[in-house]
Structures are given as C-alpha cells and as structure tokens.
C-alpha cells in the first residue's frame, strides 16, 4: 500500500512539473501585441504615450476624414502620401498610427517598418475605438 501511495505522489509531482510555464520576456510595453510583424496597441493603453510632451501621433485617414474629427494631438499624413512625407517623422522615435478602424494604420506601420523606422505602432480599432473609449477628440468646429 505504501509503495502505491509513493508511486502516486511521484506521478503527480512529475505531471505537475511538466505543467510549468516558460518564463516570459519582460518588455517595456506589455500591452503591445504583434500582428503579422506590426505592433498594435489599444487606444486606452496608447493614450499616455501619445499625450507625452513629445510624441509622434499620425492619423493616416484622408484630410476630409481627419477634418470631421480626430484623436487629440494627432497630425494628418494620409496613407497615400505617407511614403513621400517620411522626412516629417523621426526614425528613431516611436510613431503611433491611427485611422478609422485600424486597417490603414497597420498598412502605414508596414511602410514605416520597411523604411527603417525603429518602432511603428498601430492603434487597434482606430478612431472608432478611440472615440468609443471616451478619449480626447478634436472635433470639427
């Protein structure tokens, strides 16, 4: 009977040892996730970074979309002109990108990555999610 109990304890201990998780790599921004090689962050988690004294926050929507209301502090560089306006951005500083839903900002992040920018981050859900989160907007007057 004693050998059965010992065997059971050993079996449980070995089974539990196999369930350990691998240590996770600590990052500066654990909220940033990567989709197809492009970093993405939620609007709530992006807010402190884009409200910093110096931040690069780019709205890649059309000028008409931008004029109808945009995330506070975002500058407008439409996606179709981004490649021609790379000189307006600092390559060695993070660039936060936003559009309407998150698709164009993901494309913009890919353009910046290919151009050698150190960190380009798409705002998940775009302006729609930004507004829904109650975050500051610059509305048309």
Q: Where do the protein language model's features map onto the residues?
A:
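Structural scaffold elements adjacent to functional motifs in cytosolic proteins
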Residues: 57-59
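Rhodanese-like catalytic fold shared by cysteine-dependent sulfurtransferases
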Residues: 2-8, 14-55, 64-94, 103-141
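Short, surface-exposed ligand- or partner-binding patches at beta-edge/loop junctions that are enriched
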Residues: 98
């Amino acid at each position: 009977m004693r050998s059965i109990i010992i065997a059971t304890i050993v079996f449980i201990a070995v089974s539990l040892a196999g369930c350990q998780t691998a240590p996770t790599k600590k990052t500066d921004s654990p909220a940033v996730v990567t989709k197809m090689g492009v970093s993405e962050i939620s609007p709530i988690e992006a807010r402190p970074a884009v409200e910093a004294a110096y931040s690069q926050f780019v709205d890649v929507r059309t000028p008409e979309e931008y004029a109808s209301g945009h995330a506070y502090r975002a500058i407008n560089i439409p996606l179709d002109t981004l490649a021609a306006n790379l000189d307006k951005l600092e390559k060695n500083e993070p660039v936060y990108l936003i559009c309407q839903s998150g698709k164009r900002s993901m494309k913009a992040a890919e353009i910046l990555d290919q151009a050698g920018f150190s960190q380009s981050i798409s705002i998940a859900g775009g302006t729609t999610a930004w507004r829904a989160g109650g975050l500051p907007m610059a509305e048309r007057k």
